[in-house]
Regions:
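Bacterial N-terminal signal peptides
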Residues: 9-19
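Transmembrane beta-barrel domains of Gram-negative outer membranes and organellar outer membranes
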Residues: 24-227, 236-300, 311
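A short, acidic, flexible beta-alpha connecting loop/helix-capping segment that sits on the rim
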Residues: 300-306, 315
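Flexible, glycine-rich linker and terminal segments associated
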Residues: 320-322
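Bacterial N-terminal signal peptides that target proteins for export
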Residues: 1-10
């Protein structure tokens, strides 16, 4: 009987600790723009201003279809892209947070053409010309002035460009405000679209704002400064800018719903290809389940203006806090 009585405080303590962890917000959903032509050019995540020590595994799968030609450019893409991203963050108290992102990529013919055909037919959405192509057949061919720029390699697994990050808080009391700087190293193969071939850099202002104890807003404003794209040809890229915002709301002690949107300009000079030139918009909806030492999240991303972004992105992520 005495042992049973002693168990009660222990169980209550564990329950309370789990409850505390459940209310520790972990930032926006770990999703970035997977448009294959843009992906190697230091694509930003929507980030939290708060710092942390953590390790994340993020698995994303997307589908892209582009069939456009202009006077000087050809962009023919019909593929699915899978990315496994290993993300590590280390908070050095009273100084800054340092981090590294290591992506592993695989472009494939995919398996989603038939489900997408059913989806478009059922709900009456346009299919962007998908019905003119054989189902689940790989194509990734980008040309400039008739010469290859990027030629994808089906089923090739390879590293993308590794990113190093540095985050510094400039305001620690709600709202939390930070400056984020990063450098992306040319570790990926640019000729097949897995890297840029140059060092890219970026800087952003991040903000977290609490609305009570169960809702948090996130906002980012940033600029990316890419080097030249050194693929089959070398071409100069433009600086591009992005803005994003999101919200997370706890609906249950261990569960939250998240919604976010990100808008970005194109890193390419004018090509005459609408899906490359126009502003990209990605909208993400998802959920997160908190555990004592981290969280799991699942999300779906859509491109409402069908430019500069995949048709959809499915993402599953796991984060462990230290």
């Amino acid at each position: 009987m005495k042992n049973r009585v002693c168990l009660v405080p222990a169980v209550l303590t564990i329950f309370l600790l789990c409850s505390v962890y459940a209310f520790a917000f972990e930032g926006p959903l770990q999703v970035k723009n997977q448009f294959p032509i843009f992906l190697p050019i230091n694509q930003p995540y929507l980030e939290q201003a708060s710092t942390e020590s953590s390790f994340s595994l993020s698995l994303s799968h997307s589908s892209v279809f582009v069939m456009e030609d202009s006077a000087h450019w050809t962009a023919h893409l019909d593929l699915e892209l899978t990315e496994l991203n290993l993300r590590c963050r280390k908070d050095i108290p009273d100084l800054f947070e340092v981090g590294v992102d290591i992506p592993v990529l695989r472009a494939t013919p995919g398996f989603m053409d038939r489900p997408l055909e059913w989806y478009h037919d059922t709900f009456g959405f346009p299919d962007y010309g998908r019905n003119t192509r054989p189902q689940n057949e790989f194509l990734y061919d980008v040309k400039k002035d008739g010469a290859p720029l990027i030629e994808g390699d089906s089923d090739r697994v390879g590293f993308g460009d590794v990113r190093l990050t540095l985050k510094k808080k400039i305001a620690s009391i709600d709202p939390v405000i930070s400056i984020l700087a990063d450098v992306e190293l040319p570790t990926g193969n640019a000729r097949i679209g897995y890297g840029s071939g140059s060092i890219d850099s970026a800087i952003a202002v991040l903000l977290d704002k609490d609305l009570g104890s169960e809702t948090r807003l996130y906002a980012n404003l940033g600029a990316v400064f890419p080097g030249d794209l050194k693929a089959h040809q070398t071409m100069k890229l433009d600086n591009f800018f992005y803005a994003g915002t999101g919200a997370e709301s706890l609906i249950w002690p261990h569960c939250s719903l998240l919604a976010q949107i990100m808008v970005q300009t194109s890193p390419f000079p004018h090509t005459g290809i609408s899906q490359i030139d126009n502003t990209a918009v990605i909208v993400t909806l998802g959920g997160r389940y908190y555990i004592a030492t981290g969280s799991f999240e699942l999300s779906l991303t859509e491109d409402p203006n069908t430019s500069g972004a995949p048709d959809f992105i499915l993402n599953f992520s796991y984060k462990k806090r230290f």
